[in-house]
Curated annotation (Swiss-Prot):
It comes from Rhodobacter capsulatus. Antenna complexes are light-harvesting systems, which transfer the excitation energy to the reaction centers. The lineage of its organism: Bacteria, Pseudomonadati, Pseudomonadota, Alphaproteobacteria, Rhodobacterales. The chain crosses the membrane at residues 16-36. It is found in: Cell inner membrane. A bacteriochlorophyll binds at H32. PROSITE patterns: ANTENNA_COMP_ALPHA. GO terms for biological process: photosynthesis, light reaction. This is Light-harvesting protein B-870 alpha chain. Its main location: membrane. The core complex is formed by different alpha and beta chains, binding bacteriochlorophyll molecules, and arranged most probably in tetrameric structures disposed around the reaction center. The non-pigmented gamma chains may constitute additional components. Residues 37-58 are periplasmic. The gene is pufA. One of its GO terms (cellular component) is plasma membrane.
Length: 58
């Protein structure tokens, strides 16, 4: 474990951190979209039902 710092000689730290940030952002978006697609965890329809908002007429 004491020579773990040598991993940065193989990988460019800037690319690793950018790739990690992009991955985490896309993972967060994916999780939110999955939750919005389920009726129990869709906070938009739950809030609409709770406060009695009516959809705008078209």
């Amino acid at each position: 474990m004491s020579k773990f710092y040598k991993i940065w000689l193989v990988f460019d730290p800037r690319r690793v951190f950018v790739a990690q940030g992009v991955f985490l952002f896309l993972l967060a978006v994916l999780i939110h979209l999955i939750l919005l697609s389920t009726p129990a965890f869709n906070w938009l329809t739950v809030a609409t039902a709770k406060h009695g908002y009516v959809a705008a007429a078209q």
